[in-house]
Amino acid sequence: MIDNTKIRSLLEKGLAEFKLDSIGDLLLDFLLLLNKWNKTYNLTAIRDIETMVSKHLFDSLAILPWIKGNHIIDVGTGPGLPGIPLAIAKPDLQFVLLDSNGKKIRFLNEVKRQLNIKNIEPIQIRVENYHPNQGFDTVISRAFSSLEQMIKWTQHLVAQDGLWLAMKGRFPDTELVPIHQTYRVERYAVPGIEGERCCVLINNTNKE
């Protein structure tokens, strides 16, 4: 049995740190829907709903300060992470949520319908087969094993002056070695998560 009061309290405490108090109800609805679907469809390896609050919701919201532009794509979004929390926090931005897994896209379409989230577009396709009419201002992912792979498979998606955001744990020293583009690394803290977290911001411009 889920203690909604406890979950709401955890959410409110963390959201206060992000100064995002107003989105608690919608995030809770998303979390409960994710937990319900996860029991049948195995959308995420995390089963404990309290852990989902920090490792899914708060970790997603922590990269908000570095999002650029209005046209965003979350590649390998899975059950909408980080895309859904970001879209809830930024209803004025447009998010494409890309994944090749049918059950995850079905879940995202249900989230869009039930929660009436108008600024997301779930798309089921492999990233190499997706060719939009325009590039994205920000390409986000936490699905790739390395930064080099992320750039290789999403190069065609980023706008000329666009940005990649890669969510990482420890500082990715070795992953940064083969990167030809200019970049910076921002360390951040997540309520409820111990240990290092960092976001790699890679510009779509080569180093001189």
From Swiss-Prot:
UniProt enzyme class: transferase
Residues noted as binding S-adenosyl-L-methionine in the record, renumbered to the chain: 76, 81, 127-128, 142
TM region positions: none
Primary localization: cytoplasm
Record's catalysed reaction(s): guanosine(527) in 16S rRNA + S-adenosyl-L-methionine = N(7)-methylguanosine(527) in 16S rRNA + S-adenosyl-L-homocysteine
Keyword tags: Cytoplasm, Methyltransferase, rRNA processing, S-adenosyl-L-methionine, Transferase
InterPro entries named in the record: rRNA_ssu_MeTfrase_G, SAM-dependent_MTases_sf
Lineage: superkingdom: Bacteria
Assigned EC number: 2.1.1.170
Pfam families xrefs: GidB
Cellular component annotations (GO), alphabetically ordered: cytosol
GO MF, any single term: rRNA (guanine-N7-)-methyltransferase activity
Entry's localization field: Cytoplasm
Family designation: Belongs to the methyltransferase superfamily. RNA methyltransferase RsmG family.
Role of this protein: Specifically methylates the N7 position of guanine in position 527 of 16S rRNA.
HAMAP family xref list: 16SrRNA_methyltr_G
NCBIfam families: rsmG_gidB
Protein's UniProt name: Ribosomal RNA small subunit methyltransferase G
Taxonomic lineage: Bacteria, Pseudomonadati, Pseudomonadota, Gammaproteobacteria, Legionellales
